[in-house]
Amino acid sequence: MIGLIQRVERASVCVEGKEIGAIDRGLLVFVGIERADSAQQAEKLAQKLLNYRVFEDELGKMNLNVQQIGGELLLVSQFTLAANTQKGNRPSFDPAMAPQEAEPLFDYFCQTVHTHYPHTATGRFGADMRVHLINDGPVTFWLHV
């Protein structure tokens, strides 16, 4: 399971022209689910995400996590993160989990995060989404569990 996290001043996601999720300061997290992923990876990524220290302390060092700063999370599914880009000029999505299996796992991941930290918004699995964000930094990390 992959989490591409971006530190943001604010972010939102729209489907069919309607905003369905928005956050202020916090983390925008694009989530890619691979074929072999399970609830175990979802739980591990949730814990890593909630505890990953990407916010600056009073000395300017990245030493605080999203919970410590009272930030928010926006979780957005993105199957393209699981693409194989090693060969040719077109990505292969064979490593990505099939949508009918990935959707319940994404939902489980979101519920797990929300249970531990309720300041969480989500996109809509499988939808054509418009994601708007203002990066802070920019600070972007690839978490792969």
Swiss-Prot record:
GO cellular component terms listed in the entry, alphabetical order: cytoplasm
Top-rank taxon: Bacteria
EC number(s) recorded for this UniProt protein: 3.1.1.96
InterPro entries xref list: Daa-tRNA_deacyls_DTD, DTD-like_sf
Family assignment from sequence similarity: Belongs to the DTD family.
Function: An aminoacyl-tRNA editing enzyme that deacylates mischarged D-aminoacyl-tRNAs. Also deacylates mischarged glycyl-tRNA(Ala), protecting cells against glycine mischarging by AlaRS. Acts via tRNA-based rather than protein-based catalysis; rejects L-amino acids rather than detecting D-amino acids in the active site. By recycling D-aminoacyl-tRNA to D-amino acids and free tRNA molecules, this enzyme counteracts the toxicity associated with the formation of D-aminoacyl-tRNA entities in vivo and helps enforce protein L-homochirality.
Record PANTHER family: D-AMINOACYL-TRNA DEACYLASE 1 (PTHR10472:SF5), D-TYROSYL-TRNA TYR DEACYLASE (PTHR10472)
Free-text domain note: A Gly-cisPro motif from one monomer fits into the active site of the other monomer to allow specific chiral rejection of L-amino acids.
Name the record gives this protein: D-aminoacyl-tRNA deacylase
Species name: Dichelobacter nodosus (strain VCS1703A)
Gene symbol of the encoding locus: dtd
